Amino acid sequence: MAKGEGAESGSAAGLLPTSILQASERPVQVKKEPKKKQQLSICNKLCYAVGGAPYQLTGCALGFFLQIYLLDVAKVEPLPASIILFVGRAWDAFTDPLVGFCISKSSWTRLGRLMPWIIFSTPLAIIAYFLIWFVPDFPSGTESSHGFLWYLLFYCLFETLVTCFHVPYSALTMFISTEQSERDSATAYRMTVEVLGTVIGTAIQGQIVGQAKAPCLQDQNGSVVVSEVANRTQSTASLKDTQNAYLLAAGIIASIYVLCAFILILGVREQRELYESQQAESMPFFQGLRLVMGHGPYVKLIAGFLFTSLAFMLVEGNFALFCTYTLDFRNEFQNLLLAIMLSATFTIPIWQWFLTRFGKKTAVYIGISSAVPFLILVALMERNLIVTYVVAVAAGVSVAAAFLLPWSMLPDVIDDFHLKHPHSPGTEPIFFSFYVFFTKFASGVSLGVSTLSLDFANYQRQGCSQPEQVKFTLKMLVTMAPIILILLGLLLFKLYPIDEEKRRQNKKALQALREEASSSGCSDTDSTELASIL
């Protein structure tokens, strides 16, 4: 009976037209609706943005206070201290492509490909950071050599570990959403929090260790100098209080670091691209590096931002000396810095609105160039505190654009790269790590140029007044040199090919690629189901 039923069924099937038979077999294949636009909630964006604070908190504290800490609190000699700072910066720049290479070789896990780096580097990073601000009791006569090795080791170790946090965090921009607009919005949130991080880092470190200043005495020529004798006769209790103040500040910043990392880990989930997930393994690093460095839009973008970053870093690196010696606003430096950072914080949302309304290239031209008139004003004006505050607030507007725009434009370059090289997964960390590398390279160049220029101008170390040529050199480093670099950077941005029309085309092409990958995945699933049924 069963055999006869099977024969009738086969015979009926043979009488049906092929098209009808195929249609009758298809009900198991449900046509999937196009995916709705992926929208990140405000909570998701805030959790992502908070992850940018640790790098800025620690970097700001180290940038402004490590030198004076090594010299006056840890009692490291000036030459070893300068070696620690220089080697630390050089190592910091080197670790970015190194970590980018390691991440590109990482495989996807249940937590993602980037999150494990963030999770496992965090506890080690805060331990290394805390030990930077700890003064060990070395045996008598070995303080100088042992102290040099101690601070060099933990400074380089911390820079390595914080890079293991920051490079994957930067690359995470590409994996929080497949929508350009959502990534841009999340980047704006991130830049706002990062600027707030610099403000908080400066405030915490500055307020807690504000009393950690070497005493000054009037010398016979009428100039105020740091008294070596006073430093040596400083009471042990007072020095111990200063050391404890640095440890307290380090503990608070380390706690904020952990809290921010915890929020990031809980609130953000990596999203893997469909067309990438179909690739068996990541592209070899050096092959990916050749492709990335051969991608024209990326080279033009980092070249433009290399010049503009160098301009702003010249201002940043010499701002304290400029306020102290050229403008003679010794007691206003922290307040002026706070005015710049608060202005940047409040104007980042405005720049985010501007770039979505008028385009990113337009935002670059207006945002970066807006600093030029105020830099000219600083170069020409006489000493005036009110005008200086106005310039500081206006400078914050440009700083906000300089913070936001590179990180908003990098994802566009990566999207363009993926369209040209769709079978090259794992290259995102290379893009971000080498951008950070070139940024830190610019920081090192600005430090070297500034120090050399001041040395040629006969800068008097530890003095509270300087020769006129030093004041003039500082004015050039803070005004004319940045103006020239900004103009060169803007000229390079003229060559940058990804405008708003190109972005829209890339967005449509990427969407088509995702839909193709999705339908391919559905076909593979249906084939597997059919095979199991048969």
Curated annotation (Swiss-Prot):
Keyword NAD in annotation: no
Listed GO biological process terms: brain development; carbohydrate transport; cellular response to starvation; cognition; energy homeostasis; establishment of blood-brain barrier; fatty acid transport; hippocampus development
Tissue expression summary: Widely expressed. Exhibits an oscillatory pattern of expression in brown adipose tissue and liver consistent with a circadian rhythm. Enriched in brain micro-vessels, where it is specifically present in endothelium constituting the blood-brain barrier (at protein level).
Record's bilayer topology term: Multi-pass membrane protein
Reported effect, R330H: No effect on LPC transport
Impact after mutating W407A: Significant reduction in LPC transport
Main location: membrane
Keywords of this entry: Cell membrane, Disulfide bond, Endoplasmic reticulum, Glycoprotein, Lipid transport, Membrane, Symport, Transmembrane, Transmembrane helix, Transport
Keyword Transmembrane: yes
Effect ascribed to mutating R190A: Abolishes LPC transport
Stored Pfam families: MFS_2 (PF13347)
Protein name according to UniProt: Sodium-dependent lysophosphatidylcholine symporter 1
Effect ascribed to mutating D96A: Abolishes LPC transport. Abolishes LPC transport
Molecular function GO terms recorded: fatty acid transmembrane transporter activity; long-chain fatty acid transmembrane transporter activity; lysophosphatidylcholine flippase activity; lysophospholipid:sodium symporter activity; oleate transmembrane transporter activity; symporter activity
Induction profile: By fasting in liver and brown adipose tissue as well as by cold exposure in brown adipose tissue. Expression following fasting is dependent on glucagon signaling and Ppara.
Glycosylation sites (chain numbering): N221, N231
Family matches, as SUPFAM superfamilies: MFS general substrate transporter
Protein's gene: Mfsd2a
Resulting phenotype, Y55A: Significant reduction in LPC transport
Cytoplasmic-side positions: 1-39, 102-113, 174-180, 267-297, 355-358, 421-430, 494-534
Catalytic activity annotation: a 1-acyl-sn-glycero-3-phosphocholine(in) + Na(+)(in) = a 1-acyl-sn-glycero-3-phosphocholine(out) + Na(+)(out); 1-(4Z,7Z,10Z,13Z,16Z,19Z-docosahexaenoyl)-sn-glycero-3-phosphocholine(in) + Na(+)(in) = 1-(4Z,7Z,10Z,13Z,16Z,19Z-docosahexaenoyl)-sn-glycero-3-phosphocholine(out) + Na(+)(out); 1-(9Z-octadecenoyl)-sn-glycero-3-phosphocholine(in) + Na(+)(in) = 1-(9Z-octadecenoyl)-sn-glycero-3-phosphocholine(out) + Na(+)(out); 1-hexadecanoyl-sn-glycero-3-phosphocholine(in) + Na(+)(in) = 1-hexadecanoyl-sn-glycero-3-phosphocholine(out) + Na(+)(out)
Residues passing through the membrane, by range: 40-69, 81-101, 114-133, 149-173, 181-212, 233-266, 298-324, 336-354, 359-380, 384-420, 431-457, 470-493
SS bond list: C216-C464
UniProt record similarity statement: Belongs to the major facilitator superfamily.
Effect of H166A: Abolishes LPC transport
Posttranslational modification: N-glycosylated.
